[in-house]
Amino acid sequence: MNCLLLGRGFLHRFHPFRPVLCEDSASAATTITSQFKLNYRQIFIGSSLGLAAGFALGKLGRLFIVACSAVFATIAYINSKGLIRINWPQLQQQVIGPTEQYTGFHFPSSGRFNTQSTFPTIRNWICTNPNFKLSFFSAMYVGFVSS
């Protein structure tokens, strides 16, 4: 008899698959922010990932430098013993030619850079999600220096 009096709409409120929200609690989708509009979740994730990436980059970077130096020293040693011949002028021309092409100040036909399309994209990249980016890059620097 009570089920008839309560009605279907009233019982629907107590259905077990309906999400329960308290008046003073935030939903899971709500971002946690302070009065300064800082997203603490993004800051935490950015700093954690940045620290790990910086530490790994520092360790792997040193390993990469040591490996490249060992390969270069081995090639130079084998070349000095006469087992292989390296045409250094041709190699230098092949490496430096493309480098000068990309690092030289070759302006487009208009005589200046296209800054109108460059600066808005840089500004948009910096301004979107700054909490994550600032914490990521600062923690990456700390991880890189401490490795």
UniProtKB/Swiss-Prot annotation:
Its annotated compartments are:
Membrane
Q: Name one Pfam family in it.
A: FUN14
Membrane topology summary: Single-pass membrane protein
**Mind telling me which GO cellular component terms the entry cites?**
mitochondrial outer membrane; mitochondrion
GO terms under biological process: autophagy of mitochondrion
Instruction: Give the record's keywords alphabetically.
Output: Membrane, Transmembrane, Transmembrane helix
Disulfide pairs here are none
- Please list every transmembrane segment annotated in the UniProt record, as residue ranges: 63-79
Q: Which PANTHER family match?
A: FUN14 DOMAIN CONTAINING, RE45833P
Family indicated by similarity: Belongs to the FUN14 family.
Tell me the protein's name.
Answer: Uncharacterized protein C29A4.17c
Species for this entry: Schizosaccharomyces pombe (strain 972 / ATCC 24843) (Fission yeast)
